[in-house]
């Protein structure tokens, strides 16, 4: 394989630039040419494909976001969209593609491989909800950003003896809430993977103030409900007059990546190039027990594949991601 391309797709995540840098420089060191596909699959179809060299990716390791830009392009799920993209790949002499993004991006990588263009997925999302890996690129930075914000909110919360409901990102996963909540000493952490009783939350808040606590911090994963809705439920269940709500929002997707995300992204990007050089496609890289691994994107659970097809042709996750609820137990045991 002499010429490959790299793209980023879906929501951006800190560390994507570090992964792109690793792909480009590892490929060059292996004697390969590298092209950047701008604006994800939409850019592939539009022919936004340009050569990259070592200088192109200089000084981007510390930058958040993705300098290749990203876009959601649902049309690539259709054969017509895939064939248009493949036509552009052929036009530019590209033989393999590294796709950095979430599970939707993986589906595109799988389709490219089926059409004869080996593609390797690299997990880039702050949500940490991709199967086949312990951690995704951007998660550590998002947790650190959320933790820093929660620390600041605690300062003002203590000054006024207030309760704060702080909503963090994560889509349907509670990983950011759990990690940021524990790291910031949150009093309550509410995640989609675990049920809760609003009356028990209210009782815990009141008990905390009775013990002399100066604040009460509730970290809420967005996959449960909005912070405003949760606050209304608290007010309905008890006297919560001095209650404030904060939605951290897209600040969690930006910023310079942490050292861990930079190293993780570099390892994953380089490993993806190694696989393409060996002619391997239709797989996604990951990290398990601090070791690089790869898993088939499509197949059976027994084969270790991430996704499978139903009889109706629908793509389903073989082993859906769930946040580690041992962390929830830990938080309860140390917040007394």
Swiss-Prot record:
Record keywords: Allosteric enzyme, ATP-binding, Cytoplasm, Glycolysis, Kinase, Magnesium, Metal-binding, Nucleotide-binding, Transferase
Top EC class for this record: transferase
Reaction equations catalysed: beta-D-fructose 6-phosphate + ATP = beta-D-fructose 1,6-bisphosphate + ADP + H(+)
EC assignment: 2.7.1.11
GO cellular component, one term: 6-phosphofructokinase complex
Regulation: Allosterically activated by ADP and other diphosphonucleosides, and allosterically inhibited by phosphoenolpyruvate.
Positions with a binding annotation for ADP: 21-25, 154, 185-187, 211, 213-215
GO function term, MF aspect, one: ATP binding
InterPro entries linked: ATP_PFK, ATP_PFK_prok-type, PFKA_ATP_prok, Phosphofructokinase_CS, Phosphofructokinase_dom, PKF_sf
Disulfide bonding pattern of the chain: none
Gene3D superfamilies, per the entry: 3.40.50.450, Phosphofructokinase domain (3.40.50.460)
CDD domains per UniProt: Bacterial_PFK
Catalytic residues identified in the record: 127 (proton acceptor)
Binding residues for substrate: 125-127, 162, 169-171, 222, 244, 250-253
Main location: cytoplasm
Residues involved in Mg(2+) binding: 103
Cofactor requirement: Mg(2+)
Top-level lineage group: Bacteria
Coiled coil stretches, renumbered: none
List of residues binding ATP: 11, 72-73, 102-105
Main function: Catalyzes the phosphorylation of D-fructose 6-phosphate to fructose 1,6-bisphosphate by ATP, the first committing step of glycolysis.
Assembly and binders: Homotetramer.
Family: Belongs to the phosphofructokinase type A (PFKA) family. ATP-dependent PFK group I subfamily. Prokaryotic clade 'B1' sub-subfamily.
Protein's UniProt name: ATP-dependent 6-phosphofructokinase
Protein species of origin: Streptococcus sanguinis (strain SK36)
């Amino acid at each position: 394989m002499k010429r490959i391309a790299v793209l980023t797709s879906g929501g951006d995540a800190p560390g994507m630039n570090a992964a792109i840098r690793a792909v480009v420089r590892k490929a060059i060191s292996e004697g390969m040419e590298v092209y950047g596909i701008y604006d994800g699959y939409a850019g592939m179809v539009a022919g936004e494909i340009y050569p990259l060299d070592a200088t192109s990716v200089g000084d981007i390791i510390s930058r958040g976001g993705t300098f290749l830009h990203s876009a959601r392009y649902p049309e690539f799920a259709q054969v017509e969209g895939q064939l248009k993209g493949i036509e552009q790949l052929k036009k530019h002499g590209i033989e393999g593609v590294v796709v950095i993004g979430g599970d939707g991006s993986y589906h595109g990588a799988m389709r490219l491989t089926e059409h004869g263009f080996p593609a390797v997925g690299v997990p880039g999302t702050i949500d940490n909800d991709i199967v086949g890996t312990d951690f995704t690129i951007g998660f550590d930075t998002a947790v650190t950003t959320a933790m820093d914000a929660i620390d600041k909110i605690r300062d003002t919360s203590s000054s006024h003896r207030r309760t704060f409901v702080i909503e963090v990102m994560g889509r349907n996963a509670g990983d950011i809430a759990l990690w940021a909540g524990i790291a910031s000493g949150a009093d309550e952490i509410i995640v989609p993977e675990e049920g809760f009783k609003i009356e028990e939350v209210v009782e815990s808040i009141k008990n905390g103030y009775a013990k002399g606590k100066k604040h009460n911090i509730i970290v809420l994963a967005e996959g449960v409900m909005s912070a405003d809705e949760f606050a209304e439920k608290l007010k309905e269940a008890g006297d919560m007059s001095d209650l404030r709500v904060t939605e951290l929002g897209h600040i969690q997707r930006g910023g310079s990546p942490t050292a861990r995300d930079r190293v993780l992204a570099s390892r994953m990007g380089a490993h993806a190039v190694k696989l393409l050089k060996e002619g391997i496609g239709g797989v996604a890289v990951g990290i398990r027990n601090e070791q690089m691994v790869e898993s088939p994107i499509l197949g059976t659970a027994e084969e270790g594949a991430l996704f499978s097809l139903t009889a109706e042709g629908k793509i389903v996750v073989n082993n859906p991601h769930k946040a580690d609820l041992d962390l929830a137990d830990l938080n309860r045991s140390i917040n007394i």
